[in-house]
Amino acid sequence: MASVNNYQVDCGSRSARIQPRINNGIHDEESLFEVLELSEEEFELDFHRLKSFNDVRVINNPDLSPECTNTAISRDETLESASSAFEVPSDEIAILSISSDSNKNSPPSEQPAPALRNIRSSSNSDRIDEWCLGSHLFNELHQNVPQSSDGVNHGFPVYSFKERELYTSAKLKKLTNAQRIAVQKLSRDLYPILRTCYREKTRRQLLTYHHERIFDDIPSFFPQRDFIFNYYSMPLEFDRLSDVDIDSSSRSRFTDESTGETLNRSPSAASSSLENTSWFGWTLLSRFLDREW
């Protein structure tokens, strides 16, 4: 079967056996299931088996082709496609393709593969997230991250880089110093992430401030998320977001830079600030924390 959109079909597969019948002429009234010579139920079961993905694979290295491969692609055409394409294993295709809400089982004569059982045990979003975060495609990106001996990579701490943040890191490396400062300022204005405050009166008629997350499903791979939330649980820090230094002492945190005098902030002053402020944020500033704060 000739290649279409950089795909090739293994010899002897079900898809390959369809082509001669198409060439011989198939009437329009024949349904897809008549062409495949199987019932609708069998087609559904076959689709949900991992083996069904062996019929079509993404072209990569010709040496990786399965045995008994017979295609109409020339060697030059294959090499050209192989230089710009990558191979996606069938289990990864299954993770992104098989619907988790299907309750159909494999035929009794054939036990489902372990990978398929794991796929069906979680939701679509969980499986897609797991694939995106654990795919082998990240390995090459991870190996290509330049690192210097002084522990700084283009102005950002090397240890703050995470494997799953390399896409954003590549974008940040292209920014000029002025652009980075602008991004940092914007990030601080939007920071911290997903936090809001509300007041609650206790029996002693004292105002108690609680912090709750707006969303509960924030991905855990955001760097320093727990530290961010714990840090911003200190109420007085909301008033002086741009002047706070995490590494400084408590006294220096509340010192006015213009007069050098210590600020005597009362709980009521902090309450007025918290009462009228809802804090939303963005995760981009996380990679600035170790250097700037």
From Swiss-Prot:
GO CC annotation terms, alphabetical: peroxisome
Polar residues bias: start-end ranges: 98-108, 260-273
Keywords, sorted A to Z: Autophagy, Peroxisome
A GO biological-process term: mitophagy
Location relative to the cell: Peroxisome
Main subcellular location: other
Region (Disordered): 98-121, 250-273
Function: Required for autophagic breakdown of peroxisomes, called pexophagy, through linking peroxisomes to the autophagy apparatus. Involved in regulation of the glyoxylate cycle.
Subunit structure: Interacts with PEX3, ATG8 and ATG11.
Protein name: Autophagy-related protein 36
Organism: Saccharomyces cerevisiae (strain ATCC 204508 / S288c) (Baker's yeast)
Gene field: ATG36
